[in-house]
Structure formats: structure tokens, C-alpha cells
């Protein structure tokens, strides 16, 4: 580009920045545009599948799946991770079903979690917009899109038809929200349910409520499915969960992650590190025996999980080796999950 064109471009950029503020126009190669900050999901395998070490800040994320698949559990783990790194989180509970005892067990600081239980969809999305615009929130969870009932539907009669009202509400709200979300670097998570399309002979009959707008505006879409129940004898301990990254604008999509969600305690971090460690050949598996370097970890998956829980230094070492292999930021003892979990236990014992 010749000098005159460069001067003209610089003058235009200066004028735009004067009118609309610094950062309103920029070169794509600038460092702060390329670096996408992330919040961990609490699952090492899911952080790897997402490609950047977690969900992106300043973007819209949709988590969808069947009932009791672990959607809210994943969202609560993201809140816990954001709070551990000094962030502030909000939970818009449109379903009026948030369990504070379970949230606390997952590591959420419920004393500092901002919660709203709105009456209408409009109220929920206005609260969401106000929190995003404040610039003080790191992550907002809306649970769920299906429960964002338009005011006209709530005030109407039970049998009235309200075709397309919710889709219109979501489309309008997302048009307003998307710019503010990006500027404030607030990760906004919408949890969504599944519905069946009527009369579909071929292809996937499953769809998500709330229209198509959320699919378009989301930078990341996570499909959460329960694949099996974890049992020990006759006792049900939890469920094996598979998450597929069906859309990803910040890294290659279609990657999958599997982890255990244990009843009452959420994602089993030790089990997740064990699985990823075996997949990456950092932990050796021979029959039902597991070993790391010269250390015998134990026989049977549940026993090894218990061993890793009791030996946080080995767990952290394995985790950091996995992180290095996938070009993710390593952890030190202070911010490791196990330390946090043990600190919580010791607080409760006191």
C-alpha cells in the first residue's frame, strides 16, 4: 500500500476510534484479537476437545442434550472454575430448579454466586443483558432456553396458540446481546433441551427449542449425552457422559470427550485424568492394572481413582504432562483441583 493510501487509512481509523472508541476497528493480526481467553470446564478431556483449554470468553455457548444428561453439571463446573480463578459468576434459573447443596458440592462458591429466578423470558434476558453490560461478570449461565416463556404466553389462556413467540424473543435478545458479550469478555452459556420434530422419516428428528438464532450466534455448541451407568455391585455410583463439540468457531469442531459424572460430587477429575493419561500413553494399562513410570497405581479403575485422590502430587504430574502434550497451560499446586477439593473437605471437618 502506498504512503497516501496508508495516511488516508490511518486518518479514517483515527476518526472511527474518536467516534466509537478505541478497539472499534483493528487489524486481524493484532495479538489481542488472536488470543482467545478460555475458562476451564472442569474436565480435562473436554478442555482438550475444545482446543483452547475451555470455553471461550466473550462468546455465546450452547449446551444441549436429553434430560439428566449432565448439562447443568457441566455449566456449574465452569462457574466453579471461573470463581477459582477470581472471577464472578451469575446463574439465571428460569427452570427454578437450581440445587445449592449440589452446586456447593461441585465447588461453586454459592455465597458469591449471583442468582436470579425470573418470571418471564423477557425479564430473564433483560437481567442477562444488564449483567453483561456491567462488565463485571465473567460467566453467565441461563438454565434453560426452553423455560424462557414469553410474557404473552404466561398471561394468555392455557390453550392459546403462540407460534414463533419464543424464537422471536431469542432472535431479538441475541442481536442485542452479542456485541456486549464480546466487549465485556463474559462467557454466556445457554442450556437447552431437546425436542423431536414431528413426521421426520429420514435424518435426525432431534431439534432444540428457541428457534435458529441461538445456533447461529453460538461460537461453541456442546451436545451432552449419558452413555452408561457406573455401578459397583448393586450400587449406582454415577453415569458415563459423552460430550461432542458439534460447533466450534475458535478451534476445529467435532471432537469428543468422555468423563464420569458421579452422583452428588459431579465430574470425577481423577477418573478423567486417568482416562486421558491412558489414551496418551502417559499411564500404562496392563489388563486391569495401571502404572505410571515405576509406580503401581492399583488394580481396577475405581481403586486407581482413589489412589490418585490420595496422592495429589502424582495426579498433578500426570495432568501437567497431558497439558504439555496438548499445548495447554500447566497448573501449579496452588491452583490444582485436588488441592481445592481437599481444602474444602478440611474446612467442612473444622
Curated annotation (Swiss-Prot):
Signal peptide: none annotated. ATP binds at residues 65-72. Residues 340-350 have a biased composition (Basic and acidic residues). It comes from the Bacteria. Gene3D superfamilies: P-loop containing nucleotide triphosphate hydrolases (3.40.50.300). Pfam families: RecA (PF00154), RecA_C (PF21096). Residues 326-350 are annotated as: Disordered. Keywords: ATP-binding, Cytoplasm, DNA damage, DNA recombination, DNA repair, DNA-binding, Nucleotide-binding, SOS response. InterPro entries: AAA+_ATPase, DNA_recomb/repair_RecA, DNA_recomb/repair_RecA_CS, P-loop_NTPase, RecA-like_C, RecA-like_N, RecA_ATP-bd, RecA_C_sf. GO terms for cellular component: cytosol. It is found in: Cytoplasm. GO terms for molecular function: ATP binding; ATP hydrolysis activity; ATP-dependent DNA damage sensor activity; damaged DNA binding; single-stranded DNA binding. One of its GO terms (biological process) is DNA repair. SMART domains: AAA. Its main location: cytoplasm. Belongs to the RecA family. Can catalyze the hydrolysis of ATP in the presence of single-stranded DNA, the ATP-dependent uptake of single-stranded DNA by duplex DNA, and the ATP-dependent hybridization of homologous single-stranded DNAs. It interacts with LexA causing its activation and leading to its autocatalytic cleavage. HAMAP family: RecA. This is Protein RecA. It comes from Clostridium novyi (strain NT).
